[in-house]
């Protein structure tokens, strides 16, 4: 009898320990697990906190369900404009974006579980918290409109802090359609769209950068002391790839200058493929790779969701000068995200310091009190301040007298670099990166359009991406002066 009593006692002890683990110690872990059916059900019906922009625009909110006084309906007032940033949360199709990344902060804890009751007894606020983001709503809307009908991306960053001012992937989708009883069929329709609107082209897709990568190569050349803006290079019509019968030519089919020599400054202004291909081989893969890494290449950049890593594969290029020459002009093996190239522009604008991009500036409670406040951080120093000044001056010349003139803004000093990459014949990815004003940078930007944008195979970075970038920077700067 004593043995039976002991077994019963031990059984109750184990049961109590298990309940304590699941209901108290392990509650948060199991509650946040997406496989938890109860969590999935609660996502759609429980109150969630606000997601708000820096200028007070509400992007996500929970409204009382008119059919169920105990439930709430999630609503996205800006719909497609912020879809890739805010994401969605749905019992039927899951979650994405900030809704997923800040799941724990945004959700209500008033579930009346044992752990919630205990937390409330100790004074914990069980109401949902709210998320304040750095995006400028008007700039975001303007960027979405600029890319309407096209496949591409715009990323804008405040150079001194890394605050993300715009994060746009086009085409987009309406996250409101992923809510309610038709969520599954609506999401499937979006997934079946050949333009792939759910793809995050701004931060999770990789592209050849074309000639915007020449800014990185130029930085490597100047920082190493190998060249300055007035250093001269041979100016051939074509560059013969080492160990190959293939050649690289310039966009117009001729030399960049007089056909004898050309300066580094002019080579960047006119985007000379021949000069930068040769320069890349001379510098070597390691030197370029080190500079690229200091901008954020080949490393994980902290962000609310996992970004694709931009790559400059040093080990693959170190013993392949032909591939290095092609990669040095932004083709072949180098791949980037638009966010990464916005960081390149931001680092040059920020006197050589590459800012850590951040999207959430603050998490605040239901009483409006800040619980978490973002502190600007750096990825690292990409170049010395002196080198940054040289790059700023050379890139300003690109806009005043080179391939980026369509990005110019009346009365504002603008710096930039154009790019046109050819991942497939007749399907150019067109680019512009830049910043303004040069003397006191407030915005750095990257614009990329697939397939030449509205001009198709005749599109270039200068004709398509640069005017979009210029217009968006002007809109932001002018409003800043008047607002």
Model regions and ranges:
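Periplasmic/cell-envelope proteins involved in peptidoglycan metabolism and beta-lactam response
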Residues: 1-186, 194-200, 204-211, 226-231, ...
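Beta-lactam-recognizing serine transpeptidase/beta-lactamase-like catalytic domain environment
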Residues: 160, 164-211, 216-451, 461
């Amino acid at each position: 009898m004593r043995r039976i009593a002991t077994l019963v006692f031990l059984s109750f002890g184990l049961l109590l320990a298990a309940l304590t683990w699941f209901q108290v110690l392990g509650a948060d872990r199991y509650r946040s697990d997406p496989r938890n059916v109860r969590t999935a059900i609660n996502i759609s019906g429980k109150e969630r906190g606000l997601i708000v922009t820096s200028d007070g625009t509400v992007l996500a909110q929970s409204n009382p369900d008119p059919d169920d006084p105990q439930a709430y309906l999630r609503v996205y007032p800006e719909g497609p404009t912020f879809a890739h940033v805010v994401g969605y949360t749905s019992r039927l199709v899951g979650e994405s974006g900030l809704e997923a990344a800040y799941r724990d902060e945004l959700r209500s804890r008033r579930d009346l579980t044992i752990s919630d009751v205990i937390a409330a007894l100790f004074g914990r606020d069980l109401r949902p918290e709210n998320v304040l983001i750095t995006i400028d709503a008007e700039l975001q809307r303007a960027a979405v409109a600029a890319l309407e009908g096209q496949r591409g991306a715009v990323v804008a960053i405040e150079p001194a802090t890394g605050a993300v001012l715009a994060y746009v992937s086009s085409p987009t989708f309406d996250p409101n359609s992923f809510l309610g009883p038709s969520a599954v069929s609506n999401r499937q329709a979006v997934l079946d769209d050949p333009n792939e609107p759910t793809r995050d082209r701004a931060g999770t897709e990789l592209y050849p950068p074309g000639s915007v990568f020449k800014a990185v190569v130029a930085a490597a050349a100047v920082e190493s002391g190998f060249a300055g803006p007035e250093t001269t290079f041979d100016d051939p019509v074509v560059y013969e790839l080492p160990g190959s019968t293939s050649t690289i030519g310039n966009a117009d089919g001729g030399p960049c200058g007089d056909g004898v020599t050309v300066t580094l400054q002019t080579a960047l202004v006119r985007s000379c493929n021949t000069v930068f291909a040769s320069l890349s081989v001379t510098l070597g893969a390691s030197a370029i790779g080190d500079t690229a890494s200091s901008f954020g290449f080949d490393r994980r950049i902290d962000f609310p969701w996992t970004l694709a890593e931009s790559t400059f594969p040093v080990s693959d290029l170190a013993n392949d000068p032909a591939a290095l020459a092609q990669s040095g002009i932004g083709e072949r093996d180098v791949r980037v995200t638009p966010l990464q190239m916005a960081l390149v522009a931001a680092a040059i604008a920020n006197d050589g310091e590459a800012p850590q991009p951040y999207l959430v500036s603050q998490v605040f409670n239901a009483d409006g009190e800040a619980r978490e406040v973002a502190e600007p951080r750096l990825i690292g120093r990409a170049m010395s301040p002196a080198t940054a000044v040289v790059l700023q001056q050379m890139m300003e010349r690109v806009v005043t007298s080179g391939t980026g003139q369509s990005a110019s803004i009346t009365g504002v000093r603008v710096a930039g670099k154009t790019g046109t990459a050819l991942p497939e014949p007749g399907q150019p990815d067109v680019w512009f990166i830049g910043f303004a004003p040069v003397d006191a940078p407030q915005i750095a930007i990257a614009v990329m359009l697939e397939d030449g944008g509205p001009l198709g195979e005749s599109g270039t970075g200068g004709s398509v991406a640069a005017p979009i970038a210029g217009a968006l920077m002007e809109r932001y700067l002018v409003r800043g002066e008047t607002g």
